[in-house]
Amino acid sequence: MKKTCGGALLLAASPSFISCDRQQRPVRFGIVTDLHYSRREPYGTRYFPQTMEKLKEAIGVFNESNLDFVIELGDLKDQNNVPQRERTLTYLDEIEKEFQTFQGPVYHVLGNHDMDSISKEDFLQHTSNHGDADKKTYYSFICNDIKFIVLDANHNLDGTPYDRGNFDWTKAFIPKDQVLWLQEELKEKDKPVVIFIHQLLDRFSDIGKALCVSNADEIVPLLEANGNILAVFQGHHHAGHYSFRNNIHYWTMKGMIEGKLPDNNSFAVVEIDPQNNIHIDGFYNCEDKDLNRITV
């Protein structure tokens, strides 16, 4: 039986936020993805307005779980059947306000639907990341001696950014300037690294290639060469997915949008222990998962 908010085992309620400068303790963070919040009518298994209540429940758990930060992996909002910029920004403001009720640092990863009828600049102006990550689409931060890298694959194959629906969602791409930045970030090999991205990087697996970053075959070798990548956390594919290659776990989280309340939701508390083993404590549709560090 899957954990629900009422049945979850929570840690001490205070404090809800732990500063990231302590050693020899686990790093703990909350994670959600693919909320697709809007007020449009349900479509298939997607209940767009209900993600507000789903997120409220997730944030309630996060605020009682002694977390270092919370991150969402993209597609935070959606749009109406007829795209309207102002209406879409209203949806973004509403869901961002709820996201920011977490009592600690929050971070965003951009997804393709975040630019369906607005620009990246619009998204950045209506959301906030913690600290130096604010107003950036790709960035890194360090928490308890672990480096976290956020990537932005929301670009067309010619390198131009996704902008107000000017894109084919099956052709995500990480442009050269970001690849060079990533190479610089990975030069230092003194810390374990975790990657966050919306579209999938495990193009080598059995997953549909339309869900993957088009130049993933260029990015993955950079990660493998570093030798310290613990895992890649991904969204985009609402059904979830998992693969493993060359000591790197690729975990795709199930989308929060899927399924009707009160029986459906998807969020997790992730813990990375001092030995760099990862435990995903999933709620509702999100299963528990251990991503253990394999040393050779």
Language-model regions, residue ranges each:
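N-terminal export signals
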Residues: 1-19
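N-terminal active-site segment of His-dependent metallophosphoesterases
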Residues: 20-86
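Alpha/beta-hydrolase fold active-site loops
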Residues: 27, 68, 138, 146, ...
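Active-site neighborhood of phospho(di)ester-bond hydrolases with catalytic His/Asp-centered motifs
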Residues: 31-33, 70-74, 106-112, 194-197, ...
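Solvent-exposed loop/turn segments at secondary-structure junctions
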Residues: 35-38, 76-79, 112-117, 154-157, ...
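Short acidic, glycine/proline-rich loop/turn micro-motifs
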Residues: 40-44, 82, 160-165, 205-207
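Extended active-site neighborhood of metal-dependent phosphoesterases/phosphodiesterases
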Residues: 82-188, 218-229, 243-282, 294-295
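Short acidic, glycine-rich surface-loop motifs adjacent to enzyme active sites
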Residues: 187-204
